[in-house]
């Protein structure tokens, strides 16, 4: 049986039902799904929907287009310049729908035919022509020998010619059953497969039924879809019973997958054979991939348990499991349980014409389907190796407690004997080319055991609890190209016979540090190893090993035995130990053929510092692709067999070259510098062969304008202007500072001068004040002197008048004297008095005259005397007026000055300024 991989809706996160499948020129797979279109390259599922969110019933890949059919719509998906899938409808807007749902799309002679159960539509690349005939409704269209054949509903097989159906085979030929597949065979023969009536062969116009060994099974299963796997293998997908393969040379069933033995669902909705000759099965629930293009198969043996060992001899396969031992007749394909081997069995070996089984109870021999225990009181036989050194031939057995040895006697292996000197449970062991036994403890530790020459006891036992400073782990012991190798802590080690110490072993190349736990010899140039990822076929050389083929653990769909050795090589075949089955590999490689598929760039994305995403154009026609400093590339290369492919990336630009190798088709470059870049990518198999060509993608991270040459020129100019401006500003600042200093000095000098002038002015003011004070005193003195003089003159006058009365002087002389005294006195006094008074009292007379121009000179004199606070009597003496006259003058002044009666005239004049 070919191996199978199932994908359910939880794997691809889309609808359950898948109605159709196709593959484009790049090798990418497409599936018509309830929710839209699924796209798969072996690494990633992508999903696309129609504008109406409809079910996609049919698909056809042609060039760069994926034609799709749905309810009352059909068209195609195509990638735009950025790699994004966009839909283009071809549905003729003038066509009146008959509830058409496009179930089938074929291409014949450059025309694309979209077929529903009512009509078909012919698309010649430019125009769509609909065809509808209510009396002839198509059930299915087929491409046969460059022509279109049609199975009509309730009709026969017709040839479609110029829009008309020409009957080739009437419906009664197939008992009104529908034909589900038509294939052109050699020698002009045509194969027809019906829904329930089986297979038919048409030669010319003659149609004859073909009988197979499963005719009844096909009638019950209901054939729904068919595919031609190769020239001699027909695939039938059924409604009720999964997928069957028929050999067209013998018309016998080759294999059959349904839900009971690995297919995810029994209802097949479509079949497709890809470029790698693998079979894709679109199911009513999920998708199954049957790896018919691989040299891998699996023998499903439900209920046998986990396989621990096997051997093949004379087309009989003996299988040791954790439940029993089984014999499988490879010719009759019959499996039989070997009696007496119930329970755990660690190995089965064919040595010296005898079958040995390492059972949990003891070692046993097998004859046919029966076993017999060897005489032994020791439980558990875990490993058995042939010792053929120093002209001695024996078998050495490891048990739960010690080692035992078998010697031949008359061509038969005799009773085992215990090898003394050692006691411990051993899981597996190997014998090196010096006869030393290297044994792995059942749980932990490694032993180096030296045998005596007669093989009866151990002369030296050395124990290695671990090979590094970490925690103790389990050892595995294996033989790689004649050298005993130990696996411990993820690395490989061997014993250096010259330096007598354990050293790292690098004979498996890069795999030497990947946790290898088992190996199996093929020949001097090749061997198998097993690690956590799966099985590796290694091409060995003198110093190193190069992986040639990888088989993933998961590809068989069943658990593998990771306890110890899990491989057996027989001839050109390698068998792998599984749970409830055995995997089989034929040949020496499963690497893809160079050029089978094409490597292409799926997405190119750039992000700025704010994580804003922008998709870059990826078509070759696009030029001047600009990005930001972070670039993300996603490649696509079909890898449906889970091969270990290497993607090699190179980025050149900005004066550096970045190279990286990865198992992932995704790579990102962050914090790139400005400049032009060239990104190249290739994909390689384990042998280093380049697959799918090379991707070359050029892009640039343009220098922003603020860092361009013109910007730098601008910056230089601005710098020049700035420096010039600064120099000017600084120079002006110095000038202004010097000017300020000079001005300050000048100001200080002026202030000093002003201070001196102020001091002089103050001194002058003091002098003036002193002078004014002196003048005031002088004025007051004059007033009082004048008053005293007046009083004296009054006395003189009285004396003169008295002389007149006595006749001593004439009246005329007296009057003359008195008049002279009066005039002289008045002019001199008032001239001096007015000058001094005006100085002391701040222009009193002028201000009084300006404000009260109606005042007379005498009024002004009276005002001055009042300001000096003289009483009426004194004023009368000054003015030669009587007291009543002075009172009259005071009254007139009060009226002229507008002084109210309640205010003192003297106070008013004292306060006047």
Segments predicted by a language model, with ranges:
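Cytosolic signal-transmission helices at domain junctions
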Residues: 297-301, 724-794, 798
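Cytosolic nucleotide-binding catalytic cores of signal-transduction proteins
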Residues: 636-678, 682-702, 794, 800-808, ...
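Conserved beta-propeller blade signature
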Residues: 28-31, 65-68, 111-114, 147-150, ...
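Residue-level detector of Asp-centered blade-edge/turn motifs that repeat once per structural unit
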Residues: 23-26, 61-63, 107-109, 143-145, ...
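Loop/turn residues immediately N-terminal
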Residues: 34-38, 72-75, 117-121, 153-157, ...
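Residue-level "micro-hotspots" composed of small/polar
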Residues: 1-23, 35, 50-56, 76, ...
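Asp-box/WD-like beta-propeller blade repeats and closely related beta-sheet repeat scaffolds
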Residues: 83-109, 115-119, 127-138, 381-382
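Short loop/turn segments that connect beta-strands within beta-propeller blades
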Residues: 41-44, 79-82, 123-127, 160-164, ...
């Amino acid at each position: 049986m070919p191996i199978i991989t199932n994908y359910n809706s939880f794997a691809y996160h889309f609808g359950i039902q898948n109605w159709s499948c196709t593959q484009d020129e790049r090798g990418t797979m497409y599936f018509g799904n309830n929710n839209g279109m699924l796209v798969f390259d072996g690494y990633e599922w992508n999903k696309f929907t129609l504008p109406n969110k409809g079910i996609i019933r049919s698909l056809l890949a042609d060039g760069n287009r994926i034609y799709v059919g749905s309810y009352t719509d059909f068209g195609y998906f195509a990638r735009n310049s950025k790699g994004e899938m966009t839909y283009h409808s071809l549905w003729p807007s003038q066509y009146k729908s008959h509830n058409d749902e496009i179930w089938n799309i074929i291409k014949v002679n450059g025309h694309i035919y979209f077929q529903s159960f009512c009509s078909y539509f012919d698309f010649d690349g430019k125009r769509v022509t609909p065809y509808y005939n209510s009396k002839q409704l198509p059930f299915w269209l087929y491409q046969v020998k460059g022509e279109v054949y049609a199975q009509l509903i309730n009709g026969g097989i017709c040839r479609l010619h110029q829009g008309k159906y020409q009957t080739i085979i009437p419906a009664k030929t197939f008992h009104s059953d529908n034909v589900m597949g038509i294939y052109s065979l050699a020698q002009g023969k045509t194969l027809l497969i019906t829904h329930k009536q089986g297979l038919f062969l048409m030669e010319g116009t003659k149609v004859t039924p073909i009988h197979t060994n499963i005719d009844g099974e096909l009638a019950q299963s209901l054939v729904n879809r068919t595919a031609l796997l190769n020239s001699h293998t027909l695939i039938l997908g059924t409604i009720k019973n999964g997928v069957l393969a028929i050999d067209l040379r013998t018309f016998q069933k080759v294999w059959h997958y349904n839900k009971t033995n690995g297919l995810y669902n029994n209802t097949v909705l479509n079949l497709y054979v890809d470029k790698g000759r693998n079979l894709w099965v679109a199911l009513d629930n999920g998708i199954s991939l049957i790896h018919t293009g691989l040299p891998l198969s699996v023998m499903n043996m439900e209920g046998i348990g986990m396989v621990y060992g096997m051997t093949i001899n004379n087309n009989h396969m003996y299988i040791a499991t954790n439940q029993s031992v089984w014999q499988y007749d490879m010719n009759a394909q019959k499996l039989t349980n070997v009696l007496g081997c119930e329970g755990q069995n660690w190995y089965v070996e064919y040595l010296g014409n005898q079958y040995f089984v390492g059972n949990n109870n003891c070692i046993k021999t097998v004859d046919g389907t029966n076993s017999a225990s060897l005489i032994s009181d020791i439980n558990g036989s875990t490993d058995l190796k042939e010792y053929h050194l120093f002209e001695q031939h024996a078998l050495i057995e490891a048990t739960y407690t010690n080692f035992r040895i078998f010697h031949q006697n008359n061509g038969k292996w005799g009773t085992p004997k215990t090898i003394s000197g050692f006691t411990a449970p051993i899981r597996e062991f190997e014998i090196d080319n010096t006869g030393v036994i290297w044994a792995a403890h059942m749980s932990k530790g490694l032993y180096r055991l030296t045998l005596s020459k007669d093989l009866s006891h151990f002369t030296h036992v050395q124990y290695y609890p671990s090979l590094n400073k970490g925690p103790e782990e389990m050892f595995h012991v294996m033989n790689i190209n004649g050298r005993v190798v130990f696996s411990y802590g993820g690395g490989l080690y061997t014993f250096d016979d010259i330096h007598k110490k354990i050293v790292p072993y690098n004979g498996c190349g890069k795999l030497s540090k990947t946790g290898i736990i088992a190996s199996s010899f093929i020949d001097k140039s090749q061997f198998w190893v097993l690690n956590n990822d799966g099985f590796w076929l290694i091409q060995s050389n003198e110093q190193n090993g190069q992986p040639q083929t990888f088989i993933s653990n998961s590809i068989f769909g069943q658990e593998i035995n990771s306890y110890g050795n899990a491989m057996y090589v027989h001839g050109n075949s390698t068998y792998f130990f599984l749970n409830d089955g055995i995997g089989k590999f034929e040949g020496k490689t499963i690497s893809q053929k160079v050029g089978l598929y094409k490597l292409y760039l799926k997405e190119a994305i750039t992000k700025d510092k704010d994580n804003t995403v922008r998709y870059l154009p990826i078509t070759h026609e696009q030029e001047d692709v600009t990005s930001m400093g972070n670039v993300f590339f996603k490649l696509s290369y079909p890898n449906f067999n889970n091969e270990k492919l290497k993607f090699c990336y190179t980025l050149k630009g900005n004066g550096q070259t970045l190279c990286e190798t990865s198992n992932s088709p995704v790579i990102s470059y962050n914090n790139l510098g400005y400049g032009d870049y060239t990104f190249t990518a290739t994909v390689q198999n384990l042998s280093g062969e380049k697959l799918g060509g090379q991707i070359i993608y050029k892009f640039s991270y343009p220098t922003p304008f603020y860092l361009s040459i013109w910007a730098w020129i601008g910056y230089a100019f601005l710098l020049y202007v700035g420096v010039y401006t600064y120099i000017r500003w600084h120079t002006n600042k110095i000038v202004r500072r010097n000017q300020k200093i000079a001005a300050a000095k000048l100001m200080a000098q002026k202030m000093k001068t002003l201070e001196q002038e102020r001091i002089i002015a103050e001194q002058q003011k003091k002098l003036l004040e002193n002078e004014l004070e002196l003048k005031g005193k002088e004025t007051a003195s004059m007033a009082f002197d004048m008053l005293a003089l007046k009083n004296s003159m009054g006395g003189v006058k009285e004396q003169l008048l008295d002389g007149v009365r006595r006749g001593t002087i004439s009246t005329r002389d007296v009057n003359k004297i008195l008049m002279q005294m009066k005039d002289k006195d008045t002019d001199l006094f008032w001239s001096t008095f007015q000058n001094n008074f005006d100085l002391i009292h701040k222009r009193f007379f002028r201000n009084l005259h300006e404000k009260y121009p109606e005042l007379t000179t005498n009024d002004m004199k009276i005002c001055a005397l009042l300001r000096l606070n003289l009483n009426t009597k004194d004023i009368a003496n000054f003015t030669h007026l009587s007291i009543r006259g002075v009172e009259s003058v005071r009254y007139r002044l009060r009226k002229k000055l507008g002084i109210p009666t309640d205010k003192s005239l003297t106070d008013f004049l004292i306060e006047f300024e």
